[in-house]
């Protein structure tokens, strides 16, 4: 199988049919809701917190709350429901997580979205959790992952997952490929394309996004939604520590399998980096919206479906020619 990644692909323009890119509609439907953009900030502790989740929901964006403060999830779901906002949480597969599902069911609290968040999602433990959630909270939209193969997509969909997350270790602060020799790092876009050939339900591309153009490429190769970490890290509102060096502010960004997340140096598959503090999150979201509208106009359409139909070329690591933003 020939493989490629984001930097190897250039999408080919089609005849433009709009007078202005502002006519282009970058919204997307996932489950029973329509969202302003086909992007979701990674459910990582230095990317999202309750305040950011609430603001995203208020403004019409999709979010997935992380699972690293497990005792707060019940209250979070209650709060979001009381405010009339979508509730979207993450769970793992350990015994305590089953107890959370039981508690939600007992209190008649069904989150709109539940993401089963496991590094190697093609696992019996994930399938068992899908079955359990669907039994106890049948109305919840279940996202399961992460996987990197057609077999993984098939099994999770057959178990009842409503969407599958694709990507094993391509993220900027993930070192799975280095530590284990496994993953989709370096061929994430090909893995997405491969998985999309068998998927009957939405796919969420997770990891490896370095530019806004990569969002359009993900849509072209089968993603309904694109999960992004590094581009959403380092904002003024971002959780995590801030440091100042030579008058420049930096924000920390670490992987969910890093020792900074785990609190111990055991089974580490993530690292920490410091990112130049950016502006506000709303400005990044607006820039993504404008760039995606431009992508749609280059695709010759008015909405995201146009991007799925464009041709492409493989140019092997040469398209940027050293250019940077």
Swiss-Prot record:
Q: Name one GO biological process term.
A: purine nucleotide metabolic process
Specify the domain of life of the species encoding this protein.
Bacteria
Q: Which cysteines are joined by disulfide bonds?
A: none
Q: InterPro entries, per this entry?
A: Aldolase_TIM (IPR013785), GMP_reductase (IPR050139), GuaC_type_2 (IPR005994), IMP_DH/GMP_Rdtase_CS (IPR015875), IMP_DH_GMPRt (IPR001093)
List the Pfam families hit by this protein, alphabetically.
IMPDH
- Residues that bind NADP(+): 203-226
Keyword NADP part of the UniProt annotation: yes
The record ties this protein, via SMART domains, to: IMPDH
Any idea which residues are catalytic in this one? 174
For whether the record's keyword set contains Cell wall biogenesis/degradation, the answer is: no
The record's Gene Ontology cellular component field reads: cytosol; GMP reductase complex
Q: Which SUPFAM superfamilies match?
A: Inosine monophosphate dehydrogenase (IMPDH)
* One of the record's GO molecular function terms: GMP reductase activity
**Catalytic activity reported:** IMP + NH4(+) + NADP(+) = GMP + NADPH + 2 H(+)
Keyword list, A-Z: NADP, Oxidoreductase
Instruction: Report the EC number(s), separated by commas if there are several.
Output: 1.7.1.7
Family to which this protein belongs: Belongs to the IMPDH/GMPR family. GuaC type 2 subfamily.
Question: What's this protein's function?
Answer: Catalyzes the irreversible NADPH-dependent deamination of GMP to IMP. It functions in the conversion of nucleobase, nucleoside and nucleotide derivatives of G to A nucleotides, and in maintaining the intracellular balance of A and G nucleotides.
How is this protein named in the record? GMP reductase
The species is Pediococcus pentosaceus (strain ATCC 25745 / CCUG 21536 / LMG 10740 / 183-1w)
Q: What is the lineage of its organism?
A: Bacteria, Bacillati, Bacillota, Bacilli, Lactobacillales
């Amino acid at each position: 199988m020939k493989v490629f990644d984001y930097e190897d692909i250039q999408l080919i323009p089609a005849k433009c049919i709009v007078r202005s890119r502002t006519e282009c509609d970058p919204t997307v439907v996932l489950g029973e809701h329509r969202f302003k953009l086909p992007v979701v900030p990674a459910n990582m502790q230095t990317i999202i917190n309750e305040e950011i989740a609430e603001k995203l929901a208020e403004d019409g964006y999709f979010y997935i709350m992380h699972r690293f403060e497990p005792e707060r999830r019940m209250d979070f779901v209650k709060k979001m429901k009381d405010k009339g906002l979508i509730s979207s949480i993450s769970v793992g597969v350990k015994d305590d997580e089953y107890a959370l599902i039981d508690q939600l069911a007992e209190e008649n609290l069904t989150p709109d979205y539940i993401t089963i968040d496991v590094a190697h999602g093609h696992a019996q433990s994930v399938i068992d959790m899908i079955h359990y959630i669907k039994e106890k909270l049948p109305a919840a939209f279940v996202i399961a992952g992460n996987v990197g193969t057609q077999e993984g997509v098939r099994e999770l969909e057959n178990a009842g997952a409503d969407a599958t997350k694709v990507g094993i270790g391509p993220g900027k602060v993930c070192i799975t490929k280095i530590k284990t020799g496994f993953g989709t790092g370096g061929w994430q876009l090909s893995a997405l394309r491969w998985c999309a050939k068998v998927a009957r339900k939405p796919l969420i591309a997770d990891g490896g996004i370095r530019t806004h153009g990569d969002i359009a490429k993900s849509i072209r190769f089968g993603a309904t939604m694109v999960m992004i970490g590094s581009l959403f890290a380092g904002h003024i509102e971002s959780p995590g520590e801030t440091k100042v060096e030579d008058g420049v502010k930096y924000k920390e960004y670490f992987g969910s399998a890093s020792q900074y997340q785990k609190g111990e140096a055991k089974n580490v598959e993530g690292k920490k980096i410091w990112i130049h503090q950016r502006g506000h999150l709303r400005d990044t979201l607006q820039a993504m919206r404008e760039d995606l509208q431009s992508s749609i106009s280059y695709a010759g359409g008015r909405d995201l479906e146009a991007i799925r139909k464009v041709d492409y070329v493989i140019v092997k690591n040469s398209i940027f020619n050293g250019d940077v933003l």
